[in-house]
Amino acid sequence: MLRFSFTLLLIAVTHPLFAQFTYAPINVPGATSTEARGINNNGEIVGFYVIAACVEQRQSMEVPTCPTHGFKLVNGRYIELMVPTSFRTAIMGVNDYGDLVGFYVTSELTCSSSVYHGFIWYHTNTVRKLDYPGTDVCPTSSSAAITVPFGINKAGTVVGGVWGIDPNGSSRSFPSRGWVWKSGTFSTMNPTLPGNPAGACCWSVTGISNTGVLAGLLFQSDFWQAWMKAGTDQDFFTYPTVNQCCDTTATGVNSAVDMIGFDGGPSSFSAGNGWFTKHIELNEVNDTEVKPSFIKMAYPGSTNIQPPGPLPTFPFGINDARGIVGTYIDTNNQQHGFLAKPNF
């Protein structure tokens, strides 16, 4: 269902000559906040926006709790997308065919609470409901398990997680498990560190490349950790930051195994230190895993606190040309989308 479209040219933000990325803002006209979540190899960008007075908190950036409307940005034109019968739609990813994934919220006569469903919105304009087993139920408690698809590749494989959420949408808790959906079947995806140490929990798959490489997060050894899985090879890593030790969220991966993410994790305060790392497999020495080399991502500008710091920046989607989309927070605590292109 296409509700409206606007044409808008992306204007690059002025940046220093030494900047690693050139940024352009993404703002849906009339919205109070905009988040860009996915980009495909054709340059189509998807995400969601809010028109109410609602701001996502930094400790809950992965899954939105505000009343969202989905959008697609194609050739400078914004198109609103709402799943039929829904009053909230969040688009989280897009593949090269233009198939979309995300979740929506609706009312059902047999349920007194709002009901959440994952979905695939095919480029043929057919919507398929996508619910991990056990999540397609009427919420009966203050925390319901919902299906959150984060990405889809050209083969039609979808990845995501099962997340706990307040049925009223006012708060969000940890993920419980990651999953991969292929040819109509869900498979659980919960990788653990070498040696399978005790205490692992709270998985989610957050990205998939056209070559089938997976990105995700888990909580283990006292920290949120990012991971990459390519076949039987698994890498686990954390991002260094001055504000906290090691909590790390990975949000996307492309066919070259370039990865993106930010510091922090679910219900863990994030300073908004975005990061990019080139082909993570090149970090291996004689098949021994080593810490990736990170390039910091920060939307141009600075905070108005003392001492001033970079604007909080959250990369969420990456394509094979290293085009990156995400969200930044301005000095008025408002969220905006962005498109970043590398200068290397």
Describe these PLM feature segments.
Residues 1-6:
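Bacterial N-terminal signal peptides that target proteins for export
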Residues 7, 17-18:
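Cleavable N-terminal signal peptides
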Residues 19-344:
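Residue-level hotspots at or immediately adjacent to binding/recognition sites across diverse folds
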